[in-house]
Amino acid sequence: MSRYRGPRFKKIRRLGALPGLTSKRPRAGSDLRNQSRSGKKSQYRIRLEEKQKLRFHYGLTERQLLKYVRIAGKAKGSTGQVLLQLLEMRLDNILFRLGMALTIPQARQLVNHGHILVNGRIVDIPSYRCKPRDIITVKDEQNSRTLVQNLLDSSAPEELPNHLTLHTFQYEGLVNQIIDRKCVGLKINELLVVEYYSRQT
């Protein structure tokens, strides 16, 4: 299944706010109206919607998300929390959380076009897994820095999560540590996502 490229507002009206997909928000009460029209949701549908929320927020294909779930399932600790850590530490998401891009698809484009360096080397793989002490910088070229500066100026001021530091004037971000669960930028019940996949096998 390919990455979603359809109408974004349609998705947030059904699933709620997806800041990684779009900065738009559903109108207040739209969730309740949708729920009343569709009647009581089945447990399967609730799990499916949480999975879809995760997939659309981080801009993943079904195959990519399944791969992350399997990796998380083999790691120590809570599968759901490890899954969120894996997704949050992707380079495209780190750029988004730093405010260097307004959405994750926009961050993915920055990476694909070679504007971003990790520890002094160009990385053009959006799924690159960042680690503590990684230094993310914008390429020292005028078009790269002008592009990111415009995005920084356009992004709404938000408090950075504690696992990241941003040095705006140096066009540099630092990964301080693995993200804490409470700093994840999406309202999600990750256990329902894990349950969804465990019932598919």
UniProtKB/Swiss-Prot annotation:
It is found in: Plastid, Chloroplast. InterPro entries: Ribosomal_uS4, Ribosomal_uS4_bac-type, Ribosomal_uS4_CS, Ribosomal_uS4_N, S4_RNA-bd, S4_RNA-bd_sf. Residues 20-44 are annotated as: Disordered. GO terms for biological process: ribosomal small subunit biogenesis; translation. Residues 89-152 form the S4 RNA-binding domain. Keywords: Chloroplast, Plastid, Ribonucleoprotein, Ribosomal protein, RNA-binding, rRNA-binding. SMART domains: Ribosomal_S4 (SM01390), S4 (SM00363). The keyword Oxidoreductase does not apply. GO terms for molecular function: rRNA binding; structural constituent of ribosome. GO terms for cellular component: chloroplast; small ribosomal subunit. Pfam families: Ribosomal_S4 (PF00163), S4 (PF01479). It comes from the Eukaryota. Its main location: plastid. Part of the 30S ribosomal subunit. Contacts protein S5. The interaction surface between S4 and S5 is involved in control of translational fidelity. Belongs to the universal ribosomal protein uS4 family. One of the primary rRNA binding proteins, it binds directly to 16S rRNA where it nucleates assembly of the body of the 30S subunit. This is Small ribosomal subunit protein uS4c.
